[in-house]
Every structure is written in C-alpha cells, then in structure tokens.
C-alpha cells in the first residue's frame, strides 16, 4: 500500500520530530558500535561483556562527580558490612550472599542443606500443640521456614529417622520413592545441577546487564554533552555507578595485595581506573575485612544422616560450564581470567569468574539497574531521585529477599498522601452507566480530607489519632525515613486538577516500591513448608480448622442453591464438547505427553550425518487433548483420585515482591467435569439483579465500562464524608478453602437431580462423579520436584490452582462472609466481590467508630474460617481499592510493573515491539516521558543485534524505524503499539533523507508450527508416546506404550461431532472429484479434510511447543540463515546478504469495499491547548480563526501522560461496553469452534478459489455443519470487504483508555471539514463498517499527533494538527 506523499508541508512539531529522528539515528549508530565492539560475524560472549563493562566504566568516569563517587562507595561499604553479619545461609529461603575470601579458590559451602518436608513440619507442629511443657516440636516462629534451624532445633540421627526437638521423623534417601512419607530431606544442589539454587541469584532481562549498562550510560553521555541542565542523577546515574563500583570492589578485594592506611578510604575514581587497567589498587580496611574467610554454619544433609551428594562448587561448575559453552576456537584462557565477577550466558544462570568475591554480583548489578530505571521514571516528581537511592541501599543489604518490607515503609505514606487535606476537582454528580462523562463546568472543586484513613492508620500503629503522631510514626525508618518525609512534605497539600496531577504518580511509585526487586525466587525444597499453609499449620498458627462446619455455610448455601437452579443437565456428548473447548487453551496442566525424536527431523536437516536426539514433552492442554482425548473421558480417569503413590504435579509462579508460589495442577478429566458448574456460576454472577456485586463477571474488556462502578463510588465518597469504602483483605482465602466449603457445594449438588445420561456412559451420575472429585480434594496429593532425583509429596486439602471454578468459588466464599457481616452488624452495605478481593460501600452510623466496626468485621471473618487483615493491610477509606486498581476522587491508578520477566526471556530475534509496548505501559503507570524515551532508545539499540550460536547480525536503523519495519512505533514519547498509518502518512517529513531511500530487511520467519509437527509425527504409526493422565501412565496389559497414530485416531473418534462427520462423508467425494479436475491450485487440500482435524491440531500444538521451547535456538538459527542474516556456520568466509523489501508506505488510497479513503493532514486546521485553568480548547480553521471552543471534559485518566489525558479531555470518554475498534469480520469464516489447525484465512482462501456451486461442499469437507454453511454463504460476497477491514486494522493501534473516547466531537469535526456529499458516504447506514474504520483511524492518528506534539513541545501551549479523510466511491 504506497502513498504519494509530500503535498502536506511539515509543521514545526514534525520538523522537531525529524530532527529528533536524526539524533536518534546518530545515537543508534554510535551507541551500537560502542555497545557491540565485536563487529565481525563470529563473537565470543564473555570477551564482549568484559569490553562492555570496561567501556561503561570509562563513560562513568567522564560523567561522575566526586560526590556521586562518594555516595556509591558508601553504599557498597554498607553492603559489605551487612554481608559479614550473616553466617547462616539458611536464615531465609532466599539465595544467600556468600563470601569467598581472597585466598579461597572455591566458595566455602557445597553440601546441601537439611530441609523439613510438609509432613515433617506438620508432625513438629502437632507435637508442640499436644505438649503442655512446650519442649517437643516447634512453635509458630520456627515453623515459618522449611530449613532445620541450627540455632533452635535439636537434631539427632536415629537410624532411618532423624529426631528433631524430640520428634522422630523418617529421613529421605536415594532409595526412597515419593510414596514414602519423609519428614526430613535435603535441598536441591547449590550449584551445577539442572535445578540448582544458583538460578535464584539472577533476574531475567531481555539483554545482558553488560549491554544494558553501557547502552544506558552511553545515552546519558550523549544527552549530557553540551547540556548543563541535563539531570544525569535523575536518570539513575548514581544507581548505575554504584553497580560498577560494586563489581570493581569485588575484583579489587579478591586480587589486591596492598592495603591503605587505617581510616583512609578508597576513591571511587581510582577504583574504576584500576579496574579498567587491570592493576589492583590498595584497598581500605572495610574491603580487607570484607574479603576475610567466613565460617558458615547450617544443618547440612550429612548432619541428618543423608549421604552427601558430592555436588560441584560454584567456581568449579562455572568454569566447566563456561568452557563447555564457549564456541570452538575461542580464547578460553582470557575468559577464565576475566576481571568481571560474572558473565551472562544466553540461557541459564550466570557464570562466576575468579574475580567474584561474593555470590551476589549478578543480583546487585540488576538492582542497581532496576532502581536506575525507577529513578528515571520518577524524575518528574520532587524528592524521588534520593528516594530510589535509598531503595537501592536497602535492597542491596540483603539481596534476594523480597522487597515487600520497603512497601511496608513507603505504602503508608502513599495512603496518607491521598488522605491529607487538599482541594480536588470532581464531577458534581456521578454519571449514568453509559453516558459520556461531564464537561469541566459540571465539575466542582471540593475540600477533601480522609479522616477514616487517619483513624485506621493510627489504630494500626497503636498511636494517638492525629496527623502529627501519624507523621512521626511513618518516618521512623532510619534508612528511608528522611527521603519519605521530604516527599510527603512536598505533596501532602497538593491541589489536584487535570493540569496538576503528579500526586497520582507519587502514590503509584510509593505503593509498589518493592517491584524494583523483580521476580523473586526462593529455595524449591522449602516451598512445601514456606509456600503452603497446611491443615495442621493453619490450626497451629491461626486456630482455624477448615474442616469444621461454621455459621457461614448457611449463607454460602443460598448462593450454591441459586447456582444449581441454573445449571444445564450435562450430557456425555456435552462433556466431549467441553473438552474440545479446553483444547483451545495453550496453558499447562497436570497431564503430559512425551516422545523421543531427533532435532534434524524437526528442522528438516536431511544433510546432517549425526543424530541429535531430544525428548518432545508437553503439558499444554491443546497437545494433550489432541493426542489423548479418549483417555481423558472414561470411567476410570473421571473417578481417579491422587495418592502418595500417584500424586499430581505442581508448578511454580513468581510475582514481584512476593514469595514464590506453588501451583497445584489439575488433570483434564477434573477440568472437564467442572465445565457445566463453571458455566452455571458465570451465568448466575452476570444476573442484573445482583446490582453489579460480582464485578469481574460483568467485565467486557472495556476499561471505562468495567471501572464505572469504582469511579462512581469514589466520586460519591468525595461528596459524602460519611461514606466509606472498606476493602476487606482476605489474602489467605485460598488457603482456607477446605473440606467445609466443599461440603456445602456437595450438598447443593445432591439436592437437585441434574444427571442426563452420565451413568450410562461413565458408570456414575454427574453428581456422583462431582462428589467423588470434590471429596478427593480433601486429601489431594501433589508432587513437587526438588531436582532430578528427589520429589516431595504434599497432602493438600485446599482447592487445586487449575480448577476452572477457583475464582467463582472464592467469590461465593467472599459473598458468604459479606452476607454474614451484614446479618451480624445490621449495617446496610453494597459490596463488590471477585475471588478474594472485596470492598463494601457503607455509611458509618453515628454511634459507631470505623476502627471498632472493622475489628468486628475481622472477628466475623475469623468465625467464618478466614483471616482478614483489613485494619493493618487494606486501603480502606474514601478511596476505592479493588483488583489491583486504586480509584481516588474518580481517578484510576494501576500498579507499577517490574522491569524484568518471570521466566528467562533473553532477546533472540524478531519483533521488539512487545518489549517496547511493555515499557510504554510502565511509563503510563507513573513512569514519565524521560523513562520511556530512555527505554525505547536502549531497546532498539540492543534489539538491533541478532545473535545465535556465536554468530551475529546488526539491523540498520531504517529497518527499525520505517513503517513496515520491525517496530512500527513512533520512537518517542508514549507511542501506540502500532502507528504504521501515522508513520506512513508523515514518512517524508520525519525520516532522514538517506533513510527514505533504504529498504527494510525482512523479519526472519520460523517454520510454520504445523509443518514442524508434521515432521515430528511423520512416523506416527511406530512412534511410541508416553501419555500421563492424572498421574497415571497409559499403557496396555503388557506395559507397551501406544503409538501416536493410534492415539490420534482414537482421539478423533472421541472428539468428532457426528453431524459434522456425516455431512463431511456425504460431500467428501463430490469435493475431491472436483478438486482433482479443477484448474486451480488448492495446495495440499487433504489437510483441509475434517477427518484429519485432530491430527492437524496435534501437529500444530506439538510444532508450536517445539519451536518456542525445546528447539527455539535452532529454529532461530535456521530462520536467520534463511533470511541471509548470518552464515551457515562459524568461520564462514563470505558474509551473507540479507533480503530487503521496500519500506511499506500507503498507496494513494485504502479500500473499504467500494469506498476509497485517503488521509491527509491540513496544517492550518488544529486544536490549541493552553495548560492552565483559565483556557478552554480552541479549534482553528484554515484562516487561522477560532471556529469552535470546547470545554475540557472530566475523565478518570488524569494519572495518564499528558498526551493521553488531554486527548480524552477533548473527546471525553463513555462507559458503554463497546470500544473504538475495527471489528474482525473475517472471524465469521473461522472454524475455531470445531478445529484448531485452521484459521479464517485458510477458509477464505479456499472459498475464493472454489466456484459458487461447490462452496457448500468445500465447507462441509472442512467440517462446517449445514447451519454454519447457510450463515456463511450470506457473507461470502463480502470476503474482499472483510479482508480490506482486516488489513486496515493492521495499520493502527491505541491505548485502551483512548479506545473509550466519545465520538460526538469527532463526528462534529468530520462534518465540518467534509462536504455534505462526501460525509454522506461516511454516514450511509448501509456501511457501518466504513464509519467505524474511519473513526478508529481518525482517533488513532489523532492520538499519535497528540503524542508527537507533547513529546516535542517547548512550551505549555500545544497545537495539535488534525487528520482529514478524503472519501470517494471506487468506480
């Protein structure tokens, strides 16, 4: 689609953006060359990283002041002192800081630590409960960790038992299997093994820390050059400098032979200069102390009589692993002598070098970078540069532990800032559910103070109820108190309006400071104790027995009875369809398929002489169901219960600033049984009679519509000082969902006969099967794999994590508690619930105190069997906190996001757009434009390098920046995820001339998943597959495994729908006879056959898993070689030539059916914004005269960046359930309802080749039924229109908040600039798709124009150029 541009003269903003693009390109080229010193095809990773770290030091030396050096050295000194205080590596479940003295070649610990299993800890707790003397077993404090505490636990070996505090516990040995009830075992290996603890010490970034540091510092250097006003410290420089000083300090402490005089400290500048030269400096006394030998003490595996595993030490493992993964011919000696304490591999944990003094180098270096990003993201806020230095100081003292403690210090300050006396602007009244929000004239400025927050916080601290006492208490923390007080004093009386809304960013940063810690992991072996509250632990620690019947059951029963009245009687046929619906999910579960294959087969490498075997293993639902559906729905599997001998598998989930969590996977037979109940629960909770009580069930994925109740409730709180929102914090609700709660559900199921043929097919009725399953959850057994040889089995009485009904069932529990609270307190309330989240809107009676009321609610919750910490832990008050969103004065605030990823996500090749989208989202949540600009530049520079197996390729700037390239985003400000239309329309105004003349390099394309899967299953009739359903392996009486071919045949017979199958058979030969003689290329049309749908789904699922997980690097390599980006092998003499295409520009027109659209910008028609409270929005015409004046419209997105909130101030927002989007009408041709291997595009392509008289037969050949065919034939004439709309949708994107823009002013403007005849085309009621497309593209272009104007603005007066569509009929 290329468009002849150039008719529009550039505006000043576009000239500035053009200049910025030239600057970006210069930064791109210069920084990339410095960042990637090895420009040849073949690279050595570790040498590259050392060069990068040294260059980062050189940049820091040029930038740093002595004051910054002193601050960085002082932080590292404090860290070193803290390191010497911890001689027990098992004092917490997180990876410890271990010191290796300057004289030691290896870190002084190798033996695994002794660990208590859940079974062992329960026995100790039970012993203490039954021992009046308090000598046997353990108390509550000792039960927090899974390690055996060397200081408080008395351990004796007694044969096959270990006596811990007087309790005999069976110990683990290599001969035990998981069915043995083991009380004492050992942790996973510290290092070396596949599941070694060392992986806890790293965080997952898309690029190496060395690359990230040097890129950020280079960008700071270039921006600071000649600009005295550039705030280098506000961009996180001191934090990064601290990281460099730390790494250099480890090296110096390990290698230095000389000492400074007493009380003489080292200069940071001298330290970095010495590191660059490789000449160790004289070190001060604190470094000398830091590097002295440590005597670590903990209970080891041999201390409890377990034979030591003889694991490798960290230094030994690192050396072997690094040599093993070094490309042939590389300089291995220099790798081992590296000055940097660690090098990062493309996958897996980092390697420690001889320069490493401690185990914390990778983690502390990450913390320095993470807090630098946060510092840059708060540069627009007063006091936060110092705050994030304090955050770094705190996190670095005990790296690896969760940063939740910071939130406990900073979050109260955020809460208080939203409660102190100030003036705020809100609508005079709340809006009806679907109306546009009000103009500014309908707003009022209100004096606001939240005394409820004051009372609750003071009661939590147990101090007098006044602001002075609260302020003194909040700032007691020695390290953080002074900077928090400064921030508080700056903002506590800040007046808030659309032009002055930084307070929302302040609250956002303070609330989620712990996210700077990233995704924290902990010792896997202790998770059964640390990560799960067992039945015994709940009784011992909280006095709650989840088996006992309670008063709340009667309230829950009311809801379950109502749900059962809506349940549709399940049938065996329906169960199959529910299973097929589950197969559309790519999520994992408890069931798995495994088979052996060869890498060369997967890659289609027929010329490879050596075998490269690998095991294809998948627990994704789509692959398991496609291969084994017939094994899932049968009388045996549907009644299967877990046991110690055959437990169910677990997974893990990490959340920023939270402990690692266990996931209790549930087998597919259980999930299919739950489907009818799940649908009934959803239908019940969507009933309008509930007055939106079940909030999430009503959500449409439309941000304003879904938030309207929160917004209105928070506005009501401003107008009514007696109205309060009580956020009941039942964060442990899942852990208390035990037998009692399930018995209520079982009783409700048995009260209503709902069976419909289940007994005939499966031997038991649906009710009996459900009772068996739910009762089985009372003693569910799950295996947790600690490492390759050891797994712990846990007895779990809570609901499995994978249960479809978890959220809805928890909601019923929450509803029961709220109903019980209403009955007991006799205070009317409107509550809103989802899962364990609940808040209630109520007016506090004159004779009641809010603190007393909340304490009463907590007691009632305890009586209901739940722990509710509303007083101390929740955000109750005159703001509304629900589902991670805080709404204050009608304004929404979402939590910040961690910079790292939960799982390894090293950038390899392809689209960096997803990274940029995440970083822009971070910017919109309090991050500011400086942070987004830095992250955008840093990302495109680093993502320009593709690398695999020691070969690399660099993308040129045009391929990244041009429309149709690899990004399609405006490289400044807060760009939309897709700005291809705007970039195409303004391409010649903003791109440097030499860029305009360049093509873009094609994005490497990995093999299609279905082709990969077909290759892997090509020998399906002899390929044996291990299928595990519910923990049991499928095999015949002789123990033989089934073949893939047999599995897929049987699965298809189970999954196929008879009506589709009959119609397929009826028309099969007609279609095949026509296809054999037709003069059209249908490709391999046999793959379209309905009879092959299950095999096709299996091939696609298995191919996807293989390409994305098992063989990702090899498929990346193949794609890059095929695209001409890298050579076939290392050492190749000739450099490949990549394939280029023209930069993708729009044609003169875009087609929407018979209508053509051309977009242009008229430079003389614009909106004018002046950022103060006295001016409205003005629309100017070509004669430079104001023709329309608009008042600002209030909306709930003042926390968003200026470009977004001012656009919405012009349009306003609505709360309707529909949004600005080009509907994907091609979905009408999608076969996703009955087969997963084909897409709508496949069907549309087929229909365009098949003559009209054969279309019905062709569709039945694919598997469509008669009704679907009849409906589809109505749309076949519109295929080209739907394709046009689909292509249009690929040219624009916008933020979710912008999608809710009201269109009345947009429509008014379009009527103003278009002739009546032209507008008539747009307003044709027969063409709703055209009108929708124009509106979407207009608002998308307008949002991009707002972004550019605000990003390039030099004053508070902004002019926004307006896009204009030109429409005509296609003759």
UniProtKB/Swiss-Prot annotation:
GO cellular component, one term: virion component
EC number per UniProt: 2.7.7.48
Disulfide topology: none
GO molecular function, one term: nucleotide binding
Catalytic activity: RNA(n) + a ribonucleoside 5'-triphosphate = RNA(n+1) + diphosphate
Keyword list, A-Z: Hydrolase, Nucleotide-binding, Nucleotidyltransferase, RNA-directed RNA polymerase, Transferase, Viral RNA replication, Virion
Family: Belongs to the reoviridae RNA-directed RNA polymerase family.
Name by which UniProt lists this protein: RNA-directed RNA polymerase VP2
């Amino acid at each position: 689609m290329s468009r002849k541009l150039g008719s529009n003269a550039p505006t000043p903003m576009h000239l500035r953006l053009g200049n910025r693009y030239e600057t970006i390109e210069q930064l791109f080229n210069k920084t990339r060359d410095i960042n990637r010193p090895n420009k040849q095809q073949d690279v050595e990773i570790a040498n590259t990283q050392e060069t990068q770290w040294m260059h980062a030091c050189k940049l820091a030396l040029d930038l740093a002041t002595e004051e910054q050096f002193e601050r960085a050295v002082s932080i590292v000194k404090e860290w070193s002192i803290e390191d010497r205080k911890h001689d027990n590596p098992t004092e917490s479940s997180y990876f410890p800081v271990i010191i290796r003295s300057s004289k030691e070649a290896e870190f002084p610990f190798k033996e695994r630590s002794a660990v208590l299993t859940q079974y062992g800890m329960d026995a100790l707790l039970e012993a203490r409960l039954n021992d009046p003397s308090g000598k046997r077993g353990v108390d509550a404090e000792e039960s927090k960790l899974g390690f055996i505490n060397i200081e408080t636990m008395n351990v004796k070996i007694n044969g096959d038992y270990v006596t811990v505090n007087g309790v005999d516990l069976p110990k683990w040995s290599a001969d035990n299997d998981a069915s043995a009830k083991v009380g004492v075992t050992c942790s996973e290996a510290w290092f070396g093994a596949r599941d070694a603890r060392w992986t806890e010490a790293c965080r997952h970034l898309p690029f190496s820390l060395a690359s990230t540091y040097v890129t950020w510092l280079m960008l700071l250097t270039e921006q600071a050059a000649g600009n005295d006003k550039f705030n280098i410290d506000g961009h996180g420089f001191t934090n990064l400098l601290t990281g460099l000083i730390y790494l250099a300090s480890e090296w110096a402490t390990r290698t230095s032979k000389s000492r400074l005089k007493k009380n003489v400290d080292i200069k940071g500048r001298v330290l970095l200069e010495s590191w660059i030269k490789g000449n160790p400096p004289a070190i001060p006394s604190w470094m000398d102390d830091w590097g002295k030998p440590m005597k670590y003490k903990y209970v080891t595996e041999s201390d409890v009589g377990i034979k030591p595993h003889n694991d490798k030490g960290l230094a030994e493992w690192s050396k072997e692993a690094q040599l093993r993964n070094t490309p042939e011919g590389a300089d291995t000696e220099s790798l081992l002598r590296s000055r940097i304490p660690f090098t990062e591999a493309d996958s897996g944990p980092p390697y420690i070098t001889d320069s490493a003094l401690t185990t914390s180098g990778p983690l502390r270096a990450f913390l320095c970078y993470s807090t630098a990003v946060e510092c840059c993201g708060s540069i627009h806020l007063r006091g936060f540069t110092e705050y994030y230095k304090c955050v770094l100081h705190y996190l670095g003292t005990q790296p690896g532990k969760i940063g939740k403690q910071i939130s406990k210090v900073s979050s109260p300050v955020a809460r208080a800032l939203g409660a102190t006396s100030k003036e705020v602007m809100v609508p005079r009244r709340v809006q009806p559910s679907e109306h546009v929000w009000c103009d500014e004239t309908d707003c009022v400025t209100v004096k606001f103070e939240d005394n409820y927050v004051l009372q609750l916080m003071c009661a939590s601290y147990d101090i007098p109820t006044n602001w002075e006492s609260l302020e003194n208490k909040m700032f007691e923390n020695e390290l953080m108190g002074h900077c928090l007080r400064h921030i508080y004093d700056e903002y506590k009386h800040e007046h808030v309006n659309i032009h002055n809304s930084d307070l929302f960013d302040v609250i956002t940063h303070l609330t989620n400071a712990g996210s700077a810690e990233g995704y924290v992991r902990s010792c896997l072996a202790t998770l059964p104790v640390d990560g799960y509250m067992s039945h015994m632990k709940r009784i011992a620690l909280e006095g709650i027995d989840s088996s006992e019947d309670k008063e709340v059951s009667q309230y829950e029963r009311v809801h379950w009875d109502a749900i059962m009245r809506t349940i549709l009687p399940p049938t065996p046929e329906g169960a199959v369809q529910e299973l097929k619906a589950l197969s559309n999910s790519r999520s994992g579960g408890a069931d798995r398929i495994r088979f052996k294959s060869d890498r060369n087969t997967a890659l289609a490498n027929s010329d490879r002489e050596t075998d490269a075997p690998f095991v294809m293993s998948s627990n994704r639902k789509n692959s398991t169901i496609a291969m084994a559906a017939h094994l899932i729905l049968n009388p045996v599997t549907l009644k299967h219960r877990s046991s110690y001998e055959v437990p169910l598998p677990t997974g893990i989930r990490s959340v920023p600033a939270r402990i690692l969590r266990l996931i209790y996977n549930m087998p597919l037979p259980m999930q299919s049984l739950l489907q009818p109940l799940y649908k009934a629960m959803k239908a019940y909770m969507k009933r309008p009679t509930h007055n939106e009580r079940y909030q999430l069930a009503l959500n449409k994925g439309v941000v304003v519509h879904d938030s309207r109740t929160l917004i209105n409730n928070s506005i009501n709180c401003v107008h009514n000082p007696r109205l309060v929102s009580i956020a009941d914090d039942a964060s442990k609700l899942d852990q208390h969902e035990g037998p009692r709660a399930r018995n209520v559900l079982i009783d409700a199921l048995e009260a209503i006969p709902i069976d419909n043929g289940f007994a005939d097919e499966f031997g038991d009725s649906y009710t009996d099967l459900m009772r068996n399953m739910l009762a089985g959850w009372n003693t569910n057994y799950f295996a947790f794999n600690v490492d390759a040889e050891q797994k712990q089995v846990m007895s779990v009485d809570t609901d499995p994590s994978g249960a479809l009904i978890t959220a809805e069932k928890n909601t019923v529990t929450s509803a029961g508690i709220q109903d019980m609270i209403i009955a007991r307190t006799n205070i009317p309330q409107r509550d809103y619930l989802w899962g364990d989240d609940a808040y209630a809107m109520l007016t506090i009676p004159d004779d009641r105190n809010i603190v007393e009321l909340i304490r009463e609610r907590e007691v009632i919750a305890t009586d209901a069997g739940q722990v509710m910490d509303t007083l101390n832990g929740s955000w109750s008050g005159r703001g509304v906190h629900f589902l991670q969103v805080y709404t204050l004065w009608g304004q929404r605030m979402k939590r910040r996001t961690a910079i790292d990823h939960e799982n390894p996500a090293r950038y390899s090749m392809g689209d960096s757009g997803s990274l940029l989208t995440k970083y822009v989202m971070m910017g919109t949540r309090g991050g500011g434009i400086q942070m987004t600009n830095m992250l955008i530049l840093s990302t495109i520079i680093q993502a320009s390098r593709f690398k695999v197996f020691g070969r690399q390729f660099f993308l040129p700037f045009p391929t990244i920046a041009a429309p149709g390239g690899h990004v399609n985003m405006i490289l400044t400000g807060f760009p939309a995820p897709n700005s291809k239309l705007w970039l195409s329309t303004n391409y010649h105004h903003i791109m440097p001339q030499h860029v305009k003349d360049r093509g873009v390099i094609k994005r490497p394309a990995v093999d299609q998943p279905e082709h990969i899967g077909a290759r892997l299953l090509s020998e399906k009739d002899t390929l044996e597959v291990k299928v595990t359903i519910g923990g049991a392996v499928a095999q015949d009486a002789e123990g033989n495994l089934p073949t893939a071919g047999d599995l897929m045949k049987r699965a298809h017979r189970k999954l196929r729908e008879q009506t589709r199958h009959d119609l397929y058979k009826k028309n099969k030969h007609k279609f095949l006879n026509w296809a054999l003689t037709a003069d059209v290329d249908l490709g391999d049309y046999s793959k379209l056959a309905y009879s092959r749908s299950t095999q096709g789904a299996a091939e696609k699922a298995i191919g996807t898993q293989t390409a994305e997980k098992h063989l990702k690097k090899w498929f990346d390599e193949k794609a890059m070689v095929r695209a001409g980006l890298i050579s076939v092998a290392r050492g190749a003499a000739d450099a490949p030539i990549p394939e280029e295409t023209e930069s993708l520009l729009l044609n003169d027109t875009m087609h929407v059916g018979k209508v053509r659209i051309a977009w242009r910008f008229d430079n003389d028609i614009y909106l004018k914004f002046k950022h103060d409270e006295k001016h409205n929005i003005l629309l100017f015409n070509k004669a430079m005269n104001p023709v329309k004046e608009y008042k600002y419209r209030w909306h709930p997105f003042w926390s968003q960046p200026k470009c977004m909130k001012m656009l919405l101030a012009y349009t306003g927002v609505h709360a309707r359930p529909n949004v600005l989007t080009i509907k994907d009408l091609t979905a009408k041709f999608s076969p996703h309802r009955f087969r997963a291997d084909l897409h709508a595009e496949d069907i549309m392509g087929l229909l365009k080749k098949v003559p009209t008289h054969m279309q019905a037969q062709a569709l039945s050949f694919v598997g469509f039924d008669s009704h679907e065919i009849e409906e589809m034939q109505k749309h076949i004439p519109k295929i080209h229109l739907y394709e046009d709309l689909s292509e249009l949708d690929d040219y624009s994107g916008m933020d979710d908040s912008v999608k809710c823009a009201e269109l009345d002013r947009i429509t008014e403007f379009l009527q103003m600039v278009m002739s009546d005849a032209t507008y008539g085309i747009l307003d044709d009621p027969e063409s709703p798709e055209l009108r929708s497309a124009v509106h979407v593209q207009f608002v998308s272009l307008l949002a991009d124009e707002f972004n550019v104007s605000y990003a390039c603005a030099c004053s508070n007066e902004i002019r926004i150029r307006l896009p204009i569509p030109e429409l005509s009929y296609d003759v």
